[in-house]
């Protein structure tokens, strides 16, 4: 009976651990209109669950599952300047945002590497520095995130612990 109970507990907790391990912190970089749309499904025609005013501050999000260029937002949204939590609302099917309007920078002063594959042994695509470039997330695999540079010139993998999801400051 104890084994069955432990197995049930592990089965229930495993998805929570998986989301936390594969989550990608980012911030919203949408300047195309007065609001950023958060959708109920991973497609452009999906119903808008909620909006974020683009002129009201900087928003940080935690991204989970990715599907066809759309990231599912996990947990709440944070308005960085006021350090306020914005509760997700308006959907029972999840909250989705397109990868073209979420991004992050690179942490620290040291060189950071974009690689062809999610491995420290993979060939380099580009060496980047913390204040040089904005990156958009495309995929996540374990402790690696696949990114494309804001100008679209480079695509590669980098370690998740090297990203900076704070739009107001550089990360150590």
Short names for language-model regions:
Residues 1-4:
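Positively charged n-region of N-terminal signal peptides that target proteins for export
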Residues 7-15:
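Bacterial N-terminal signal peptides
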Residues 16-20:
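Sec/Tat signal peptide C-region and signal peptidase I cleavage site
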Residues 21-27, 33, 43, 47-50, ...:
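Boundary regions of SH3-family modules and the immediately adjacent low-complexity/disordered segments
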Residues 38, 55, 73-74, 114, ...:
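Short alpha-helical segments in extracytoplasmic peptidoglycan/chitin-binding modules
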Residues 40-60, 64, 116-140:
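SH3/SH3-like (including bacterial SH3b) beta-barrel domains
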Residues 67-72, 142-146:
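Short aromatic-glycine-enriched beta-strand elements
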């Amino acid at each position: 009976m104890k084994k069955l109970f432990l197995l049930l507990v592990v089965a229930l907790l495993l998805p929570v651990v998986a989301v936390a391990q594969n989550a990608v912190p980012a911030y919203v970089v949408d300047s195309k209109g007065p609001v950023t749309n958060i959708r109920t499904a991973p497609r452009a025609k999906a119903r808008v669950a909620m909006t974020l005013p683009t002129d009201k501050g900087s928003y940080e999000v935690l991204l989970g599952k990715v599907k066809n260029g759309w990231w599912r937002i996990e947990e709440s949204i944070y308005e960085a300047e006021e350090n306020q939590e914005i509760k997700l609302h308006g959907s029972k099917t999840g909250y989705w945002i397109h990868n073209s309007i979420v991004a992050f920078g690179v942490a620290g002063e040291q060189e950071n590497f974009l690689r062809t594959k999610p491995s420290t042994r993979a060939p380099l695509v580009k060496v980047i520095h913390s204040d040089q470039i904005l990156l958009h997330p495309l995929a996540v695999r374990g402790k690696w995130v696949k990114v494309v540079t804001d100008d679209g010139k480079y695509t590669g993998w980098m370690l998740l612990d090297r990203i900076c999801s704070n739009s107001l400051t550089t990360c150590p």
